């Protein structure tokens, strides 16, 4: 072989290698970065979207806050869902309600967090960034804008948070869980777990129910003190002729105190720190007593279950009351403000609800009518369309 022929063969081989490398790069699954943290209300909808996007062939990465609870939740969910979620973190936390010094330092901390997020996104090179609300989404959204990466935001609450109010101005797409919470937001609902979406509809469930009214009390995974103390006392004052069964989730730190409260009230209850399979608990119940976080309201609607809401009184912009109104206005729920509530007042309402299942079934059916089925899939549809544009 002559030298010119060898050089020609070598050049041809190099072109072939370049084509193969280029093809592999093009065919490599695209990455989607999900930004969420701070509370389960931001993280769990993000995980539902992560699963939907992964099923469509996307790699999933997660941007959270250093020291946040989301790292553990994402790792656990990743194992359960059977695919890897690359977790990265930035140094950021909320400032509202933390005093003047926190406000003064906020601009510098935000700038630092934006730079951290920018470096992470440059490394990941995602096709899309999804902000699920909470303070961690702010710097990540700003970084996505700087890098000209498409941005989708989702607002879980009926009253939009500060982060999403800012990001909405330049996001490529704004999705909302409750109608009207953000200007020009597309109403898709809150993505919920698949096992909750597949619970039998209320008409079918209530046709099979008999015996004592079953009450699910959700004090929250962290424990809502007012619910854990007031509800046992209220059940101690209801009409003794009304049969009922109670499952009460307290949060791990309030377990023993809540058990003691039921004992003092002379009421039998199954008191647990945490409910692993919430879908089964919601299916079992005739109605729930709980806070009105965005995800709780959406899960009740998805299943079709009536509720007594006791909104967290210190929620920013009173967003829990606004969340509750979504089901209260259609007759699917009753709302009682904590400051106006006592065991005696709550007992009066419980006497009404424990009197029979007819009203409870009506509430459940109305809740189901407010649901947005397959929210995670619809969310993923919008994301995929934006990526392929």
Curated annotation (Swiss-Prot):
It catalyses: di-trans,octa-cis-undecaprenyl diphospho-N-acetyl-alpha-D-muramoyl-L-alanyl-D-glutamyl-meso-2,6-diaminopimeloyl-D-alanyl-D-alanine + UDP-N-acetyl-alpha-D-glucosamine = di-trans,octa-cis-undecaprenyl diphospho-[N-acetyl-alpha-D-glucosaminyl-(1->4)]-N-acetyl-alpha-D-muramoyl-L-alanyl-D-glutamyl-meso-2,6-diaminopimeloyl-D-alanyl-D-alanine + UDP + H(+). Keywords: Cell cycle, Cell division, Cell inner membrane, Cell membrane, Cell shape, Cell wall biogenesis/degradation, Glycosyltransferase, Membrane, Peptidoglycan synthesis, Transferase. GO terms for cellular component: plasma membrane. Coiled coil: none annotated. Pathway: Cell wall biogenesis; peptidoglycan biosynthesis. Its EC number is 2.4.1.227. It is found in: Cell inner membrane. UDP-N-acetyl-alpha-D-glucosamine binds at residues 39-41, 157, 193, 221, 275, 294-299, 320. It is an enzyme of class 2 (transferase). GO terms for molecular function: UDP-N-acetyl-D-glucosamine:N-acetylmuramoyl-L-alanyl-D-glutamyl-meso-2,6-diaminopimelyl-D-alanyl-D-alanine-diphosphoundecaprenol 4-beta-N-acetylglucosaminlytransferase activity; undecaprenyldiphospho-muramoylpentapeptide beta-N-acetylglucosaminyltransferase activity. It is a peripheral membrane protein. GO terms for biological process: carbohydrate metabolic process; cell division; cell wall organization; lipid glycosylation; peptidoglycan biosynthetic process; regulation of cell shape. It holds the Pfam family Glyco_transf_28. Cell wall formation. Catalyzes the transfer of a GlcNAc subunit on undecaprenyl-pyrophosphoryl-MurNAc-pentapeptide (lipid intermediate I) to form undecaprenyl-pyrophosphoryl-MurNAc-(pentapeptide)GlcNAc (lipid intermediate II). NCBIfam families: murG (TIGR01133). Belongs to the glycosyltransferase 28 family. MurG subfamily. HAMAP family: MurG. This is UDP-N-acetylglucosamine--N-acetylmuramyl-(pentapeptide) pyrophosphoryl-undecaprenol N-acetylglucosamine transferase. The gene is murG.
């Amino acid at each position: 072989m002559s030298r010119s022929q060898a050089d020609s063969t070598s050049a041809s081989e190099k072109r072939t290698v370049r084509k193969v490398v280029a093809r592999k790069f093009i065919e490599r699954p695209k990455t989607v970065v999900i930004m969420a943290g701070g509370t389960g209300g931001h993280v769990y909808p993000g995980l539902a979207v992560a699963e939907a996007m992964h099923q469509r062939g996307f790699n999933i990465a997660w941007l959270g806050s250093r020291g946040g609870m989301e790292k553990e939740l994402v790792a656990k969910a990743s194992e359960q869902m059977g695919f890897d979620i690359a977790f990265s973190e930035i140094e950021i936390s909320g400032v509202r309600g933390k005093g003047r010094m926190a406000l003064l330092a906020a601009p510098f901390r935000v700038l630092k967090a934006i730079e951290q997020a920018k470096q992470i996104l440059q490394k990941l090179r995602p096709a899309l960034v999804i902000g699920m609300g909470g303070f961690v989404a702010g710097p990540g959204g700003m970084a996505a804008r700087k890098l000209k990466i498409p941005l989708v935001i989702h607002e879980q609450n009926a009253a939009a948070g500060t982060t999403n109010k800012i990001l909405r101005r330049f996001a490529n797409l704004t999705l909302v869980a409750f109608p009207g919470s953000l200007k020009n937001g597309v109403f898709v609902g809150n993505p919920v777990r698949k096992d909750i979406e597949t619970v039998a509809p209320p008409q079918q469930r209530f046709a099979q129910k008999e015996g004592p009214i079953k009450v699910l009390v959700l004090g929250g995974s962290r424990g809502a003190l007012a619910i854990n103390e007031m509800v046992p006392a209220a059940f101690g004052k209801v009409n003794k002729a009304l049969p009922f069964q109670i499952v009460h989730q307290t949060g791990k730190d309030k377990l023993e105190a809540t058990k003691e409260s039921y004992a003092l009230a002379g009421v039998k209850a199954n008191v647990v720190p945490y409910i692993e399979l919430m879908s089964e608990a919601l299916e079992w119940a005739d109605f729930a007593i709980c806070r009105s976080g965005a995800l709780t309201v959406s899960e009740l609607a998805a299943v079709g279950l009536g509720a007594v809401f006791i909104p967290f009184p210190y929620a920013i912009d009173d967003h829990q009351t606004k969340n509750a109104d979504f089901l209260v206005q259609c007759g699917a729920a009753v709302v009682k403000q904590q400051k106006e509530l006592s065991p005696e007042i709550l007992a009066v309402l419980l006497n009404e609800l424990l009197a029979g299942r007819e009203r409870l079934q009506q509430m459940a059916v109305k809740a189901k009518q407010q649901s947005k089925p397959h929210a995670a899939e619809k969310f993923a549809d919008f994301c995929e369309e934006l990526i392929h544009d």
